[in-house]
Amino acid sequence: MAGTAKHIIILGGGITGLQTALSLLTCRRAYKVTLLATHFPGDNSIQYTSPLAGGHWRSHVGLAASDAHVRAWDARTYETWTQLLDGKVGEGDKKDTYEDRVKRTGLGFRESRNYWAKEGEETEPNGDGLWWKNTVEGFQILSLPETIDEKPPAGAIFGIKYKSICINVPQYLSYLFSEVTRLGARTIKASVDVSSGLDGAVRDAKRIVLASDPSSVFALVNATGLSARHIVSAEEASKLYPIRGQTVLVKGEALRSRTYVDFAGAEDIAYVVPRPGSGTTIIGGCKQVGNWAEDIDEGLNERILETAKREGMAEELRTGEDGGFEVVSVQVGWRPGRKGGPRVEIEVEGGGKVDGVWLVHAYGHAGGGYQASVGSAERVVEILGGL
């Protein structure tokens, strides 16, 4: 069987690249996978967005017909993560407990409460504006302004709760990395020459990989996130943009995930996302479209923490001096935005091949890279299986 395995290079070591590798290595077909990336789990760089994510399952996709495929990806990921935490899929001791699985994977079930300050598509009566209300477990409309056991944000006009899955993202990335290497993936830490466009990048990736493995390359998966702008056509590159985020990591794990939107300007959002098993929680945040600033905005930092205090979003974490949060770190990251949504498809030029190998793109997932990861990766597997 090994002799018939098709060799796939995956360019990119973030959530999309790692999950694509895992999906290829666990599908019914035989694939040989090489992960080629500048950064892998454990690295710290603003160019490496995945470890900087807040990390919980909450679909950002609306009801438009054009987003049906992304809705399916998100639903598939929720299903897979639930099975993983329930011990129904994945590698692990058959006697391991839920707590063991949380520690190993970095995933964990948490109740999530979402609040809105303005009416919109998502605040339709009975939750009809949220396509995923029948996908998640425990979905319930909250009666505002009073709820059973907590006071909602002062300006909230609509709220829900459901069983979400929160992510200790550094641990989850390490888990995926260990799984794909256990299953036989090779990893090469190197940067590809992007000075000659797509042809040059594919050619250089092949050169790097074939230097230590002479087996022929069947396909390359471009899972480079925002870095794809350096190798795709000018027209395609113009569709890619950063969505800057800034978050604060604080001590303690919040009891639940909380989100509050539409309470201020278009850029400000408030969320609290515990990182299961880490003893820490992410507090955010913002969505600053087109902002490439790397430095921490101290004013925004203060606003993030003040909003969390004012709206009572994480009272159990106010264990610092004067009832404040105990800050561990502050981080800035660029979500990989793309006009038109994620691009998961075979290359449109040259009949789908570049320098003699099939090229499949998988980038542009914006702030939905984690919740779409399994479904998106399985779409890549489907594309490759049809070649």
Spell out what each predicted region is.
Residues 2-16:
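Beta1/beta-strand and adjacent pyrophosphate-binding region of the FAD-binding site
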Residues 16, 41, 227:
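Conserved Rossmann-like nucleotide-cofactor binding loop
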Residues 19, 48, 198-303, 315-320:
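Flavin-dependent oxidoreductases
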Residues 26-49:
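Glycine-rich FAD pyrophosphate-binding loop
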Residues 53-151:
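Dinucleotide-binding Rossmann-like beta1-alpha1 core, especially the glycine-rich loop
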Residues 65-80, 159-175, 295-300, 373:
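Short beta-strand to alpha-helix junction loop
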Residues 142-153, 318-387:
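C-terminal catalytic lobe of FAD-dependent flavoproteins
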Residues 152, 156-219, 223, 232:
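Helical element adjacent to the flavin cofactor pocket in flavoenzyme catalytic cores
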